[in-house]
Structures are given as C-alpha cells and as structure tokens.
Amino acid sequence: MTITPQNLIALLPLLIVGLTVVVVMLSIAWRRNHFLNATLSVIGLNAALVSLWFVGQAGAMDVTPLMRVDGFAMLYTGLVLLASLATCTFAYPWLEDYNDNKDEFYLLVLIAALGGILLANANHLASLFLGIELISLPLFGLVGYAFRQKRSLEASIKYTILSAAASSFLLFGMALVYAQSGDLSFVALGKNLGDGMLNEPLLLAGFGLMIVGLGFKLSLVPFHLWTPDVYQGAPAPVSTFLATASKIAIFGVVMRLFLYAPVGDSEAIRVVLAIIAFASIIFGNLMALSQTNIKRLLGYSSISHLGYLLVALIALQTGEMSMEAVGVYLVGYLFSSLGAFGVVSLMSSPYRGPDADSLFSYRGLFWHRPILAAVMTVMMLSLAGIPMTLGFIGKFYVLAVGVQAHLWWLVGAVVVGSAIGLYYYLRVAVSLYLHAPEQPGRDAPSNWQYSAGGIVVLISALLVLVLGVWPQPLISIVRLAMPLM
C-alpha cells in the first residue's frame, strides 16, 4: 500500500496529536514544568483542530483498509478534540496544588484523544477495537489520578476490572462475527450480511456479545453499574472527559457500523436495543432523582442521554434524519456537559482533596458567584431539554425521529424520562438561588471568569443559548457531514 501526500493530509489530526504525545513525553523526561507541558498539550490539540480545515479540502477517502476520512469522521474528530481541549483547560487550575506528578495527566489525555480520533475514522472492527482500547487504557490512570483518595483509587480499580471484562466480550463477539462473515471491514460486512444471514445463530451471538462490550463503554443499562461510582471517584476534569469525548467517539463508530452493516435489519437485535434504550431512559432518570452528589447525578443523567441517542440509532434505517438527530443531540450534550462539569471543576480548583460535588456546596451560589450560578442554570435547563436551549433542539429531533419510525413506546419513554429529568435538574438549579449557608464549604476563585477554564464554561453557555435560539448553523454543519458517509 502506498501512502500519498493526500493520505497524510487526511490523517493530519491523528498525526499532530501523536506528535504532541511524543513532544510532551520528551518534555517531561527533560524537565518537569507544569505550565510548559499544559501549554504544549493545548497547542497540539488546537493545531489538530485547525488541521480539520485542510482535511476538508482533501475530500473523503479510504486512507487504509482500517480508516475512512470523510465529513462524518471530521465532525466526530472535532467534537473529541474540543472535549479533550476543555479537559486540559479545566485540569490546569485543578492540578496547581496537586502534590504528586502533574504532567502525566496531559499525556494520558492526549493518548485518550488519539484513541477518540481513531474511533471517529474507524471503518473496520480491528480499528474499532484498537480505538476503544486506546481511549480506555489512559482512563484507568486518569480516573485514579488522585490516588491518595480512597474513592478515586476504588473507582480506578472498578473501572479497570469491568472495562477489561467488557473488552473481552467485545473481542469474542468480533471473533464470532468474523467466523460467520469472513471479513471485519464495515463495508464488507454490509455486503456479506444479506439474504437473511443476520438470523444465523452465530452472527446473532457475535453481535449480542458486541452489544455487551459497547453497552458497557456507553453506560447503557444493564451495563451501567460502574458509571456513578467512577464519575464520583474520578477528578472533576476526568469526569468531563468520560462524559463527553469517550461517549461521543464510541457512539460515532457505532453509528458508522450501523450505517454500513445492516445490523439494525435484524428484528432480534432491534428488540434488544429497544429494551436497552427503554431501560436506560427510565432507570437513569429514576436513579438520578435521589442523588445529592452532582457528579453521581450527572453520571445517571448520562445513562438516560445515551438511551435517548439509542432511539435515534434504532430508527437509523428510516432515513437521514436519524443521523442528523444524533449529530445535533451530541453537540448539545457536549456543550451542556462541558459547562456543568466545568463549573464543578472550577469549584474544586485548586486540588484540596475531594471535589466540590455535594449539592450542599452549591446552595446559594448565586449570592456570591452570580455569573457562575447563571451558567450552571443554563446547563441544567439544556440537559433537561427546556426550549430556547440546544438541549431542547436535540431532544425534539429524537422525538421526531422516533415518531417517523413508529417507535411509539420509545417515544413515550423519552417523554416520561424528560418529565422525570426535569425534577432533578431543576432541583440543582433552584438550590443555586436559595439562601447561602453561613459557612460555605467550597467556592470558585473570585477571578474565575478570567481563567481559561472560566472562558470555556462561558463560551459553552453562550453556544447552548445561541444555538438553542438559532440552530440552523449547527444543522448545516451536521448535514455537511452526512452525504460524505
């Protein structure tokens, strides 16, 4: 196989982030400097983001049998890079008072971002597995980064063991699919799985095992048990990455698999996915009702959001509107989650032991940090799907797609789940405006809005509001990615 200059241009984001990993690694070996290594990481991620323009000029192409670069890959690569950039930005003030080694944090985030980019471009079950492992392995270290805290260490061990088990299910499922189809490429699977072949027991077992592995990575019920504990135990910036980049990259590659291989044509698989979606929506929202820890609440909330997205995935065979719905919903979910976890990161910075994740820590926040409280309110309203926010546009799309595909009981689950979600999101928002306790526990720095993390949070809030009122630019970008699939 010959690598041409066009191929190299198409792989620019992957190459730039890979080069940044090497540069940061050498920088750490030469001299430890927190500011220098954080700056190098942010420059590398920004350069990768800018390089997407050049990738767009090169056009869609299969760079290798494992990777396809097109509009779809560019959209999801951009979302992963934005989430990674926000994670590094939130991590810098959090790590300022951290007594152990700080620099490896950025190295692990960059390697995980590399895995996310690989997933966005994956066109083969081998690259899907490599990407998932490349994004998961650094997260084992990141989740347990505050290892002197028992909760963080426990979360890391739990995530490592369960993730390894999920990967084994995924790999075994791929082996069964290969045994039946004779190929691992998404396109070849689409060609080979015709004429009722999807009803073969071996193939159904293979895809069933893959659903178990991918369901764990996406925190879908009943493979979700790790989610609230890991979100709570992980440092706030790591929870940001887990909730955004990791989920978006994996859901993106699942979308591509369903587009090329007619997995959704099997009635048995559709029923299983519908049950998982229904359970994720209802259970995720019900469990969030009783939470008094914001990170656990957002963890259960992410389970329900992935359930909503699964509704659009099940309806994928009905038309292009499903792809549009997933793209718009994921962008809304990205900015809403970045804003919510960003506020938690700002409240928890610099590192002083456990994060400010108790709901009591946010009581009366409006009276001494009004702008920060307003930002958190906007994020809660967007996650709840209130009109005039980007979250509403995404949820409306999902409902429209469900109605179009006649998935009536899933549409009912989305409506009921949204109603339940409204209660606990508003509970967080209302607590921000109650009378502040006489001795508040934790507080954000007085100049938080001038920090890089503060700027990211403010921009996220602005985008959630502006795109909620005028979503056409976002819809146009998502549509641009679709014909190139």
Swiss-Prot record:
GO terms for biological process: ATP synthesis coupled electron transport. GO terms for molecular function: NADH dehydrogenase (ubiquinone) activity; NADH:ubiquinone reductase (non-electrogenic) activity; quinone binding. It is a multi-pass membrane protein. It is found in: Cell inner membrane. Its EC number is 7.1.1.-. It is an enzyme of class 7 (translocase). Its main location: membrane. Keywords: Cell inner membrane, Cell membrane, Membrane, NAD, Quinone, Translocase, Transmembrane, Transmembrane helix, Transport, Ubiquinone. It catalyses: a quinone + NADH + 5 H(+)(in) = a quinol + NAD(+) + 4 H(+)(out). The chain crosses the membrane at residues 8-28, 35-55, 71-91, 105-125, 127-147, 159-179, 203-223, 235-255, 271-291, 297-317, 326-346, 373-393, 408-430, 455-475. Pfam families: Proton_antipo_M. Belongs to the complex I subunit 2 family. NDH-1 is composed of 13 different subunits. Subunits NuoA, H, J, K, L, M, N constitute the membrane sector of the complex. NCBIfam families: NDH_I_N, PRK05777.1-1. NDH-1 shuttles electrons from NADH, via FMN and iron-sulfur (Fe-S) centers, to quinones in the respiratory chain. The immediate electron acceptor for the enzyme in this species is believed to be ubiquinone. Couples the redox reaction to proton translocation (for every two electrons transferred, four hydrogen ions are translocated across the cytoplasmic membrane), and thus conserves the redox energy in a proton gradient. This is NADH-quinone oxidoreductase subunit N. It comes from Escherichia coli O6:K15:H31 (strain 536 / UPEC). The lineage of its organism: Bacteria, Pseudomonadati, Pseudomonadota, Gammaproteobacteria, Enterobacterales. The gene is nuoN.
